[in-house]
C-alpha cells in the first residue's frame, strides 16, 4: 500500500472510531488528525471536510454490505430484486442512522450524490431485466428512496417496518 493510501486508511479508521465513540458532531477534524498521527493540513489533503470523511467511512462499510447482498441475489423480477437489496441496505442504514441523517442532511440535494445512489440501485435491480421500462424503474426507485428517507426520519428507525412498507408499495407492479 502506498504512503498516501496508508494515510487515507488511517484517517478513515481513526475517524470511524471517534465517530462511533463520541458521535459525529462531537468529533473534530483536529481529533481525527491527532488520532491518525498526521497534521491537520494532511487530513485536508485527503478530504475536503468532516462530512466527506464520514461519507468515505460509510462507503467503505456499505461496500461490504453490497458484496454480501450481491452474493445472495437470485431474484429476477425488479420488485423482488429491490426488496432483496433493501433488506441489506435498510438494515445497514438503520444501524448507522445517526450518521446517515447527518450525511443526507448535507448531501441529499447534491446532484452527484443523488445520481450515484440512483445509478447503483438501478444497476443492481434492472441490469438483467429483459425489458427495461424507464417510467416503472423511476417509480420503483422513488418507492425505495422515499421509504428509506421516511424510515430514517423516525425517532428510532425500524428496518422491518421499512421493508414491509416498501413491499406494499412495490406489490402493485
Residue spans for each PLM region:
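Basic, helix-initiating cap at the start of DNA-binding domains
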Residues: 1-22, 26-38, 52
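Helix-loop "lid/cap" segments that line or gate small-molecule binding pockets
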Residues: 71, 87-94, 105-108, 128, ...
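Amphipathic alpha-helical linker/stalk segments
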Residues: 57-84
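Hydrophobic alpha-helical segments that form the core
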Residues: 132-172
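A secondary-structure capping/hinge motif
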Residues: 51-53, 98
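Short hydrophobic/aromatic patch on the recognition helix
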Residues: 36-47
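Amphipathic alpha-helical segments used for helix-helix packing
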Residues: 84-115, 138, 146-150
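Amphipathic alpha-helical packing segments from all-alpha helical-bundle domains
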Residues: 107-138, 161-164
Amino acid at each position: 500500500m502506498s504512503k498516501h493510501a496508508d494515510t487515507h486508511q488511517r484517517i478513515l479508521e481513526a475517524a470511524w472510531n471517534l465517530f462511533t465513540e463520541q458521535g459525529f458532531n462531537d468529533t473534530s477534524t483536529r481529533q481525527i488528525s491527532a488520532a491518525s498521527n498526521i497534521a491537520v493540513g494532511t487530513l485536508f489533503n485527503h478530504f475536503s471536510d468532516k462530512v466527506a470523511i464520514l461519507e468515505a467511512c460509510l462507503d467503505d462499510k456499505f461496500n461490504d454490505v453490497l458484496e454480501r447482498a450481491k452474493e445472495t441475489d437470485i431474484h429476477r423480477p425488479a420488485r423482488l430484486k429491490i426488496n432483496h437489496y433493501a433488506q441489506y441496505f435498510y438494515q445497514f442504514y438503520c444501524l448507522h442512522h445517526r450518521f446517515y441523517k447527518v450525511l443526507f442532511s448535507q448531501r441529499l440535494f447534491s446532484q452527484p450524490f443523488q445520481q450515484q445512489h440512483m445509478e447503483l440501485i438501478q444497476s443492481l435491480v434492472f441490469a438483467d431485466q429483459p425489458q427495461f421500462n424507464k417510467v416503472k424503474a423511476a417509480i420503483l426507485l422513488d418507492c425505495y428512496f422515499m421509504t428509506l428517507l421516511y424510515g430514517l426520519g423516525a425517532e428510532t428507525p425500524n428496518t422491518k417496518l421499512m421493508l414491509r412498507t416498501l413491499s406494499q408499495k412495490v406489490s402493485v407492479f
